A protein has these predicted regions:
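Aromatic/glycine/proline-enriched transmembrane-helix motif characteristic
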Residues: 1-163
Length: 163
């Protein structure tokens, strides 16, 4: 991928953009850029028209930035450019969060939950719920898999005798 640095003044918004960016989203874009820098390039055609990354572009402008990392896509027809714009906005929406992975990350990061795109209070509540669940489980102790099998076998024998 050929990423190049371009002045924002050379980039142009597309005629239409299917994604509307809320103030909340732009605020979170800003927090992410402040925390990590620009981690994704803006995708533009050979004329500087933005094909993907309009929200990032808006955020960089509002931050007073004058340049951005850009990936220049060349040789696409107008129809292909429109398809790229639609696909970029839709494909991400088709995924779902792996809640167990999210829980694991949140527990690992529980001392610093300032994460762009997430409400810190919600993440703290998730940590508290996990801690409370662990406390509750510890009150009852643990049973190993062998003991669970013994209990199942005993129940099955009892049910068989009752038949």
């Amino acid at each position: 991928m050929n990423v190049t640095r371009k002045p924002l003044s050379e980039l142009r918004r597309p005629e239409r953009n299917v994604r509307m960016h809320t103030d909340k989203q732009l605020k979170e874009f800003r927090r992410s850029i402040e925390m990590f820098g620009q981690i994704r390039p803006i995708v533009v055609d050979e004329d500087g028209v933005i094909l993907a990354g309009n929200g990032l572009y808006e955020t960089l402008l509002s931050m007073g930035r004058t340049e951005a990392d850009c990936y220049v896509v060349t040789g696409l027809t107008e129809a292909q450019k429109k398809k790229l714009m639609l696909a970029d906005n839709r494909v991400f929406d088709l995924g779902v969060d792996d809640l167990s992975a999210l829980d694991a990350f949140v527990l690992e990061l529980k001392d610093d939950l300032d994460i762009p795109g997430y409400e810190e209070d919600l993440l703290r509540a998730m940590v508290m719920e996990a801690d409370e669940a662990a406390d509750t489980l510890s009150e009852y102790g643990t049973i190993d898999e062998g003991r669970i099998e013994e209990i199942r076998d005993a129940r099955e024998r009892t049910e068989a005798r009752e038949e």
